[in-house]
Structure formats: C-alpha cells, structure tokens
Amino acid sequence: MLAYIGRRLMFLPVILLGATLILFLMVQQLDPYARLALYVNDPAQLKGGKAELDRRLDKHGLNDPWYAQYAGWVAKLASGNLGWSETAKSTVVGGFAARFPATAELALFAFLPIVALAIWLGVLSAVNHNKFIDQLTRMATILGYSLPTFVLGLALLLLFYGVVRQSLPALFDGWFSPGRLSTWAQQLVNGQAFVRYTGLLTVDAALNGQWRVLWDALGHLILPVVTLSYGSWAAMLRVMRSSMLETL
C-alpha cells in the first residue's frame, strides 16, 4: 500500500505540470488584449488608448513567448502570487481570505447534522428493517442522491423564504433570508464596537456578547446548512444502514 501511494505521489508533479501547461496553452489562444483585460480593474486605466494598452502588455509580459510567460507564472505561483480575480475584484489570495471565514462557518455547521443524523437514522433504519421508518429513510437517501444541490437550495429558498417567512413574518423574523445577516445586524457588525476575532459571525457574536446577532446568524445558516449537508448525509446514512444490517 505504501509503495502504491509513493508511486502516485511521484506522478503528482508530472500531472500538475501537464494539466497547468495544457490550460495555459489554451489561454494563450486568446488575443493578448483579451488576456490584458484580466489585469485591468478600472476602465480609467486605459485612457491612453492603444499606446497605453501596448505599454501594459509589455509590463505584464503578455508579448513574451509562451514558454517565458509560463515560466513567469510558475515563479509567481511558487512565491504565493496566484494572480488577480476579476470576480472578487482583488488578488486571488485576497479573495480566498475574504471568503474563507463564511465557507468555514458553513462547513462546520453542516458537518454536525451529517454525522449525527446519519449515524442515528442509519442505526434506526437498520433496527427497523423493512418497516415504515426504514422505507422513509431509504426514500430520503434516494432523494438526496438524485436531487442536485442547486435545485434543493432554490426549492428551500422558495418554500421557506418565499412562503413560510412571508406568511408568518413575526414568527420567523430574520430566519431563512439570503445572505449572512439581516440589515440591522450587518450594521452592528460593521460598527467599531464589534470586534472580529475569527471572521465566523456566530463565534464573533458570542465573543462580543451580541446574542441577537448570534441568533440572526444562525437563522440565516439554516437553509445553506440543509442544502449543503443533505447529499452527504444521505450517502453516509446509506453506508451506516448497510453496515448495521451486516452486523445484525
């Protein structure tokens, strides 16, 4: 096993080199001016016309031979410079850093129902083999396998935010809404009195003693957590049920 893993690890640099080289050559088929657009984050930077464009092409090395550009890209990659993200309007590293806390928070809260519910319902389903609860959980796992995540997310948003919350606004105020916080909570978090210790809103709200903000953040996490965890929960439940049936 160790020898197999070692061989695979030896091939990893070759695979990475080949994959990045192919993608780089594909991008090279674009016009240099089209590739230059990735380096421009403000149209005012191009007021100089074609002369300014040519100057920027030389500045970023886009007129160099492809192998020189690739070597420069690898050198920047090795130094931690992953380039500019047009989507994030910042460096790639900056975009990752800005979005990582929200991603980590969502992953942490999604992990709990995946493990807890899958183990509990897997055991319950196996103990009640071919009974109603077993058939119900099997239907849930089939739905979890077959339903795309983006479809589930849109359906939950339509049902709970579009119907339930709008029908009972006083009962579900701040729940099921898109985003990470309500407007009032976002203003409080952006204030100078609120200290961002970790970037995780639930943790930071608790550390700041802002329990209303914590409750609001949890209410906004419900639908994303269900959407993210359902497919993994269904897969783990199925494995747990099969293992328990073999044991019993």
Per-segment meaning from a language model:
Residues 1, 48, 62, 66, ...:
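Juxtamembrane loop-helix boundary motifs flanking transmembrane segments in multi-pass membrane proteins
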Residues 1, 12-30, 102, 106, ...:
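Helix-terminus/capping and membrane-interface signal
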Residues 2-3, 100-101, 105, 109-133, ...:
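Alpha-helical transmembrane segments of integral membrane proteins
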Residues 2-4, 24, 28, 86, ...:
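Transmembrane-helix boundary motif in ABC transporter permease subunits
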Residues 6-12:
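N-terminal signal-anchor/signal peptide hydrophobic helix marking the start
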Residues 15-71, 160-208:
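Hydrophobic alpha-helical transmembrane segments of membrane transport/permease proteins
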Residues 60-119:
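An internal, D/E-rich "acidic patch" concept
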Residues 99, 103, 139-142, 146:
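Residue-level signal for discrete positions within transmembrane alpha-helices
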